[in-house]
From Swiss-Prot:
Its EC number is 3.2.1.59. It is an enzyme of class 3 (hydrolase). One of its GO terms (cellular component) is extracellular region. One of its GO terms (molecular function) is glucan endo-1,3-alpha-glucosidase activity. Pfam families: Glyco_hydro_71. Keywords: Cell cycle, Cell division, Cell wall, Cell wall biogenesis/degradation, Glycosidase, Hydrolase, Secreted, Signal. Gene3D superfamilies: Glycosidases. It catalyses: Endohydrolysis of (1->3)-alpha-D-glucosidic linkages in isolichenin, pseudonigeran and nigeran. The keyword Phosphoprotein does not apply. This is Glucan endo-1,3-alpha-glucosidase agn1. It is found in: Secreted; Secreted, Cell wall. Has a role in cell separation where it is required for the degradation of the cell wall material surrounding the septum (the septum edging) which must be hydrolyzed before full separation of the daughter cells can occur. Hydrolyzes 1,3-alpha-glucan predominantly into pentasaccharides. Not glycosylated. The gene is agn1.
Amino acid sequence: MKLVLFLVLLFSALINLTNADKMVVAHFIVGNTYPYTVSNWEEDIQDAIAVGIDGFALNMGSDAWQVERIEDAYDAAASVSSDFKLFISFDMSIISADADFIEGVVRRFADKPNQLYYDGKVFVSTFAGETDTFGYSDVSTGWDSAVKEPLASAGYPIYFVPSWTSLGQGALEESVADGFLSWNAWPTTDADMNDNDDIGYQNLANSLGKLYVAPVSPWFYTHLSYKNWAYKSDWLIIDRWNEMLSVQPDMIEVLTWNDYGESHYIGNIQGALPAGSEGYVDGFDHTAWRYLMSPYISAYKLGLSEPYINFESLFYWYRPTPKSATATADSLSYPSGGDYMEDEIFVLVYLLQSAEVTVTCGSTTQTFSGVPGVNQFTIPMETNASPSFTVARQGGTLASGTGPEIVDSLSIYNFNAYTGVLYF
């Protein structure tokens, strides 16, 4: 494993030297960092750098303590690497048209050495905010008059890239926006994700001379009193990265590093989990997905149409129960969209040479012939069974391992995913 991490770090360094303008950042929920110290931030930043992620979009609300945690994040980034960039993503579903607060935060962090600048301006993003007019006639006039112009007059011009997804392509056409971050990272029906929106956004951004930031996410499941649904996520992480290599957007934002409540985290589980999410997050490590992304990140930065495979490994993920499983003590209903998921075990194998991949779950065993490059395999789930995985070459076993048991019921509905990886 140390050799794999060394190769990933080495290749990431080469990419940073030759493709400094192509960035992959991860969306980071500051609201989940109440117990964080500088060392927690340093750990996350080092983990991100190891797979080629260039920075964090710091999603923040209005709590005073979040400003202090962001201060720690900038301090940590400065101690780890001057190349790792941070920028604020104002969560306007919480802040809601507080121009003084927004200006104060931008000014506080604008001169930090790890602040992301784009086109010579402080990079600023949002989650939502397309209905905030700050008392003016429309959203562009409001954001320009209440936020952009005062900051520019104070010597802090901003490059403004909001996530105003409800406006569709109209978000890019807003005069106040220098770019657009799409939040359309998941299919909302039983169909697989496609890149139609990305192509449209990127083409429009090109014609307007603006920036398009495309979203990539591995999964989506939330089971809380105020939101309770799943999106079809089976092969989503691979589908989405293949689409990114095809579209080659200006920038990519991974959704997310640590949104535990929506199950699309790729960082280590640490900090504070949203109340009610512990039952479907604890024990569901997603770090395998982080390492899975590395060859795709490298390929994106090189402008390649296929992932750059320079190490061998097997990744797997699956849910803890079939979609028909019952919940024995759940106060919430069955999550909408849960029936869109497939009852399968998903296996992705990176190979430099041909190998045999054997996957077993209960009474089912299948051996697949793997070829150099990326290999995708599935086998059906069986309950009361722990899936096992073996990779062999020329009669010798390269790696083997077993994942957690699949069961026929749980106390609460859980459409989160177990993930794992075998390095060899």
